[in-house]
Curated annotation (Swiss-Prot):
Native organism: Pseudomonas putida (Arthrobacter siderocapsulatus)
Effect of G202V: Increase in KM values for aromatic substrates, but not aliphatic substrates
Protein name: Mandelamide hydrolase
Superkingdom per UniProt: Bacteria
Enzyme class: hydrolase
Upper lineage: Bacteria, Pseudomonadati, Pseudomonadota, Gammaproteobacteria, Pseudomonadales
Gene induction: By growth on R,S-mandelamide, and to a lesser extent mandelate.
Length: 507
């Protein structure tokens, strides 16, 4: 198998674009930056300095929990010297990336966004990190997140600059950045870093990608290793990348998996299902932009098939919370012990800072209850057993039947039904959480891959909208190739400007 660095520049990629230098180096995509360093047009130090400066200029976003500038610059200098000495270039050689703070990276604390783990410095990297480091990537910092990954707002009361709580949106600093990979989303969207890793249980890579105007990819569960990642639900969890282009996502995926990318398909060969239920009850800006995107694809020859899954939300609800709430306790307990964190499960829970996350643990996970039904407490263990035995297989079979019956490559829908909401305690409500995950959660519960792409900016609010495609488990290569085609029609995501957003930040 050929290593990505040995391949010729991507078919269809404009060489002039790859080697063109923008006014600011932090405007480069991951692919562009790696090409410029590889061909000695710029140095790794220049790149790292540019993005470190950008990170410092946008501290009000609360995008990072930790940054190690000295170590990053030392690695950059080392790589520059390596190339000067005639070393063979690496696929990501000398290019900075960021990593969500629940994915272990040696040299950084792995807090999972919670105070009890603030002093936990792992002795080994998460397995998904290893191929990226071997490819020459430089981890400059760990990104902020919804505490313990249990939410979609990024309103983390433990890690923030003075006076500004919550990870903030790249396009409007008064709004949320999505979650739980909040910092990874806003860091890429605000051009603080060209790419970042996050984790996705029910939309936690795709939502931050969508609301920050970038691309977020959730692979099939099991495609990327999860060793060394603070868990929620082993059945549903997966790491995934966020970047500014599908090209960058494909590059990262090929490095992590060692697989060569699939050819970009012809429009006429693509069949996308529009599930009615996932297009209902949308906010007007989301509806307009995503319907416009669908029309553009259809005009190019993509086959759009209208389909229905009348019980999609009911089936998903029967799986989603039972799995996350029940699996969390045992998975976290095992993780804390196996990775020698020095913190017990009880100590972890006692230190939770964010009120919404504390409520989840104290009212549901610790007592082993799912809630109430007709005045009676619902036993969590029984709900989990039912979900695994009946509800999840039914959901998976329903997707398989839909794809087979209509000969679909993927389904397509708005990533989130609404624009990013204001960043405040109300953003942590269960109602806000349920609304944010509504469209991305069902396929997550079936272990399916999905990728969110930018569909444009809302006209009045100036906020990004995402459109997502999801395929059956194992269809990642085909899904990424379709995403490449879609991006060629819709264009890449917008770039935020600082003018007009500084005054919006809620202190």
């Amino acid at each position: 198998m050929r290593h990505p660095v040995d391949m010729p520049e991507k078919v269809g990629t404009d060489a002039k674009r790859l080697f063109a230098q923008p006014e600011h180096l932090w405007e480069l995509t991951l692919t562009e930056a790696s090409a410029l360093v590889r061909h000695r047009r710029i140095t790794s130090r220049q790149l790292v300095e540019a993005w470190l400066s950008r990170i410092a200029d946008f501290s009000e976003l609360n995008a990072f929990i930790s940054v190690d500038a000295a170590a990053a610059l030392k690695q950059a200098d080392s790589y520059d010297h390596y190339l000067e000495a005639g070393g063979d270039p690496l696929p990501l050689g000398g290019v900075p990336i960021a990593v969500k703070d629940n994915i272990q990276v040696v040299g950084f604390a792995n807090t999972a966004g919670t105070p009890a783990l603030s002093k936990f410095f792992p002795t080994c990297n998460a397995r998904v990190i290893e191929p990226l480091l071997k490819a020459g990537a430089i981890v400059v910092g760990k990104t902020n997140m919804h505490e313990l990954a249990f939410g979609t707002s990024g309103y983390n009361t433990a890690y923030h600059i003075p006076g500004v709580i919550g990870v903030r949106n790249a396009f409007d600093h008064s709004c949320i950045a999505g979650g739980s990979s909040s910092g990874s989303g806003t860091a890429v969207g605000a051009l603080l870093i060209p790419a970042a890793l996050g984790t996705d249980t029910g939309g936690s890579v795709r939502q931050p990608g969508a609301v920050n105007g970038c691309v977020g990819f959730r692979p099939t569960v099991g495609r990327y290793p999860v060793d060394g990642i603070t868990p929620i639900s082993p059945t549903r969890d997966t790491p995934g990348p966020i970047a500014r282009s599908v090209e960058d996502i494909v590059l990262l995926d090929s490095i992590i998996t060692g697989a060569l990318p699939a050819e970009v398909p012809a429009a006429e060969s693509i069949r996308l299902g529009v599930v009615d239920q996932l297009w209902a009850d949308l906010s007007e800006p989301v509806r307009k932009l995503t319907e416009d995107a669908l029309r553009k694809l259809e005009q190019q020859g993509v086959q759009i098939v209208r389909v229905s899954m009348s019980e999609i939300f009911e089936m998903s609800h029967a799986v989603s919370m039972p799995l996350a709430l029940h699996e969390c306790r045992s998975a976290l307990t095992e993780y804390l012990s196996a990775n020698e964190t020095g913190v017990s499960f009880d100590e972890l829970v006692a230190g939770i800072s964010s009120p919404d996350v504390r409520t989840i643990f104290e009212d549901y996970i610790l007592p082993g209850r799912l809630g109430e039904l007709e005045g009676q407490s619902v036993d969590l263990e029984q709900a989990y057993a039912t979900a695994m035995k009946d509800a999840r297989p039914k959901l998976i079979q329903s997707f398989e039947f839909l794809f087979k019956e209509h000969q679909l490559d993927a389904i397509i829908h708005p990533t989130t039904p609404d624009l990013a909401i204001k960043s405040n305690p109300a953003a942590t409500s269960f109602e806000a959480f349920a609304r944010m995950i509504r469209n991305a959660d069902p396929a997550s519960n079936a272990g399916m891959p999905g990728i969110s792409l930018p569909a444009g900016l809302s006209q009045q609010e100036g906020l990004p909208v995402g459109i997502e495609i999801e395929g059956l488990p194992g269809s990642d290569a085909r899904l990424l190739s379709i995403a490449n085609f879609i991006e060629s029609i819709l264009g890449r995501g917008p770039t935020p400007t600082r003018s007009g957003v500084e005054s919006k930040i809620s202190m």
